C-alpha cells in the first residue's frame, strides 16, 4: 500500500503546481487586480461556501473518530479531510484581503475547488473502509474520477 505521507506529498504538490504554473505562464497576475466588483462578490460567496464545507468536514472527521479502531482507510480519510480543511481555511483567509490581486483570487478559487475534490476523495476512502456493496463504491469512485478529470481539464484549459 501507498504510505499516507506519500499521499499527502502528492496532494500538496498538485495544489502548489497549479498557481506556480499560472504565475509562470502569466506573470502579470502578480500585479493585476480583479477586473470588476463582481469578482469580490465571488470571493465573499466562496468564503461562505468554505465555512459550510468546513463544517461538513468536521462532522465527518468526528464520525470517524467515534469508531473503535482506525484502519488504513480511516487514517487516510482523516488525513485527506484534514488537508481539505486546511484548504478551506486558506480560502477563507484569502477572502480577508481587500485589494485582492488576481493571483490571490485564482489561488482562493483553486483552493476551494481543490478542497471539494479532497472532500470527495476522503468520502471515497471512507466508503472503502466499510464492507459495502461494491457497486456503490464503484459508482462513487466513478463520480470522484469524473470530478478530478473535470478539474484537471479546467485547469489545463485555463493555463493554455
Task: Briefly describe each language-model feature range.
Residues 23-40, 69:
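Membrane-interface helix-loop junction between the first two transmembrane segments
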Residues 1-6, 69-160:
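Alpha-helical transmembrane segments of integral membrane proteins
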Residues 12-17, 51-60, 119-122:
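Hydrophobic cores of alpha-helical transmembrane segments in multi-pass inner/ER membrane proteins
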Residues 1-17, 48:
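Hydrophobic transmembrane alpha-helical segments in integral membrane proteins
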Residues 15-31, 86-100:
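Membrane-water interface of transmembrane alpha-helices
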Residues 10, 23-24, 62-75:
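Alpha-helical transmembrane-segment detector that highlights a single hydrophobic TM helix
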Residues 20-28, 44, 48, 104-107:
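N-terminal leader/targeting segments
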Residues 38-69:
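Transmembrane alpha-helix detector for multi-pass membrane proteins
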Amino acid at each position: 500500500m501507498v504510505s499516507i505521507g506519500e499521499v499527502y506529498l502528492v496532494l500538496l504538490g498538485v495544489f502548489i503546481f497549479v498557481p506556480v504554473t499560472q504565475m509562470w505562464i502569466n506573470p502579470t497576475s502578480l500585479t493585476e487586480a480583479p477586473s470588476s466588483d463582481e469578482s469580490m462578490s465571488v470571493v465573499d460567496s466562496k468564503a461562505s461556501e468554505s465555512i459550510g464545507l468546513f463544517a461538513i468536514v468536521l462532522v465527518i472527521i468526528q464520525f470517524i473518530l467515534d469508531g473503535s479502531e482506525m484502519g488504513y482507510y480511516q487514517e487516510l480519510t482523516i488525513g485527506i479531510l484534514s488537508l481539505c480543511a486546511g484548504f478551506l481555511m486558506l480560502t477563507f483567509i484569502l477572502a480577508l484581503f481587500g485589494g485582492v490581486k488576481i493571483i490571490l483570487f485564482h489561488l482562493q478559487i483553486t483552493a476551494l475547488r481543490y478542497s471539494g475534490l479532497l472532500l470527495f476523495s476522503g468520502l471515497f476512502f471512507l466508503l472503502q473502509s466499510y464492507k459495502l456493496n461494491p457497486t456503490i463504491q464503484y459508482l462513487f469512485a466513478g463520480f470522484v474520477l469524473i470530478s478530478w478529470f473535470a478539474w484537471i481539464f479546467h485547469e489545463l484549459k485555463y493555463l493554455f
